[in-house]
Amino acid sequence: MPQDDGPELIAFTPDPKAAAQQAQDQPATPEGDGAAEQPPMQGPPAPGQTGQAAQGPQAPGQGTPTGPKAAPGGQTVPPGKPQTPPQEGTGFHPFRERKARAEAPPPPDAPPAQLAEEYGLGLQALKGKCTAAGVLSAVLLLFALLDSGVLPVLDSLLPANILLLGSLALFAGCVLLSLDVLKEGLVQLTNLAPNGDTLALFAALFTLVDGVTMVFTPLRESAIPFFSPCALVLTFHLLGRYCDRSAKFQACRVAASVSQPYLVTQDPNVLGGRTAFRKWLGVPKGFGSQIRTTSQAEARFRRLTPVLLVACFCLSLVTTVAHHQPNLVFWSLSALFTAAATLGVSLALNLPLRMLGGKLAKLGVALAGWPGLLAGKGGKAALLLDQDIYPPGTVALAGSRVFGSLSMERTVAFTASVIRASGSGLTYLFDKLVRAEGSGYLPIEKIVMQETGLLGQCQGQQILVGNSDFMSRQGIALPPGIRAKDAVFCAVDRELVGMFVLKYTLHPAITPALQSMVLHRIAPVMVTRDFNLNPHRLRLWGRLPMDQLTFPDLQRRVTLSGPNQPHGPAILAVLCREGIAPFSQALIGAKRIRRAAAFSSFFVNFSACVGVVLTASLSSAGALGAMCAWHLSLFLLLWLVPVLLISLWTTQY
């Protein structure tokens, strides 16, 4: 679409409601609405403060005596010399201010296309590994059920040695399929930043050692080691890695699908000092860095991991060696680390992001990682432009007519030039009309915007463009018999020269999108420039919830919808499609995923702590029958249920 620098001046007609609206948005001062804060005035000193200071000691709260100041140590500092602050010594300081830990630098940025290729490499192979590991875990879970004695009919179905050897072989296969998880756990351990994969690494190691010792040297009762619960841990950790890479691959692929997408940010000081969501055309700088950033849910569990590591080792030694049960040390370590690793560590954020990310990708929405989800926190308003309510293609030309001596080409040139200079949403339609008529744009020198029309100056001629109400207020008579409600009229030097009948088609997704925003406590704010989109016209169309929409005055709308606005530091989402549906889905999806990750993180951390305490208690009693592989598997699966339900909840709206 051709662009120009616009007119030299955009003026506004006085609006009696603008002052009242501005007074409501600005906080009132004690001296009135127009009173500004004044700096404290320094007048002459009060009586009793002039002259020389009294000799002798002074009580706290009295004025400081004039003259040379006494420095620490009894030395006198001249008046013109700055006083050196006292240095901290090595004495006793009961209250020391703890220095804040330096934040880690953000990951390096990369183009979305490069990241999409990186995350897509080997994604199908990882999906196959998850499927195979899930099948092996299901078979191991069946073997654990046979060994538990819950169903006496199945006790003699397979011999104990066959169950043990078969379970060991299947678990070894599951370990081989989960080498990516174990490698990541080892890397994080060597970097002194252990995480959930590190706990899974120790759980697999001690479970294998316990199984091998059971085969060659039966140190305890003939019970299957914790192959089944540990295999579940490895499988769900592997599934979390797949969900993470798949969600990032989808987001990067969508963000790379267009060269200049819309960026969604939460901008400061938009509505009376409050923030608001805004979408604007730009280059997604920092999107790759945000995608690579560690989530807050993972960071919380990473802070808990060292505590769980120390607790598992210490409690295992206390409950076995200290209780004269050294033969149960590997069994206890296997149980403790398996319970600490849990099943939902890597699914707290990745599962809802994967489930809802696929739905958003179909709408052309790419969420910008965890920093983008945090960027949407606290936002309660969203700015909607003309293109959001009526995207390109939903406003069509139903008919046109020329009055007077001007040709259609000249009439289209005048009308399209004024509309483009105003930044109205009708620019797309009239740009197509200009190209269809073989016309061109004219330079607009000045423009005055009113609620129902536009006044422009072009080459010494006055151009009036507006609806029928605007023409009536300007004293321009319309031909009899014209009843076009959504028409654009054009007058040159107060002579009517043309009429363009428009047809506005409201997309079926507009009303549900607005209702969803209102239900999620995000107030839509209309910052339109199309003179046909006023509250009265929108109310007549009857399909929009006008009582829940905010419609500022014209000057505020033009200011908020103008270019070069200050934007927030983080990108919330990247949009590759027009309309309000992708915009609203991005805001709502980010809010729901952020809440789901917070709730799931709580259940994951709590279940890890509870699991360590319970397994330590049963280990101290040597309760091999109460803490068997089947029971521990059920314990882990039951604590996974809240995470699954919360993840499913994110898509139900």
Regions found by a protein language model. Name each.
Residues D5-A20, G80-A204, D210-R302, I588, ...:
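Structural motif at membrane-water interfaces of alpha-helical integral membrane proteins
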Residues S137, L201, F216, R435-H536:
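Signature of the cytosolic headpiece of P-type E1-E2 ATPases
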Residues T394-S417, P508-A509, L514:
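Basic, amphipathic juxtamembrane/active-site segments
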Residues M1-F95:
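N-terminal targeting leaders characterized by basic, low-complexity, disordered sequences
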Residues C458-G460, E495-W630:
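Conserved ATP-binding TGD loop and adjacent catalytic N/P-domain core of P-type ATPases
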Residues A172-V181, C230-V258, P268-A381, R529, ...:
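Hydrophobic alpha-helical transmembrane segments
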Residues F403-L454:
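ATP-binding catalytic core of ATPases
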Residues A375-G399:
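Asp-based phosphoryl-transfer active-site loop
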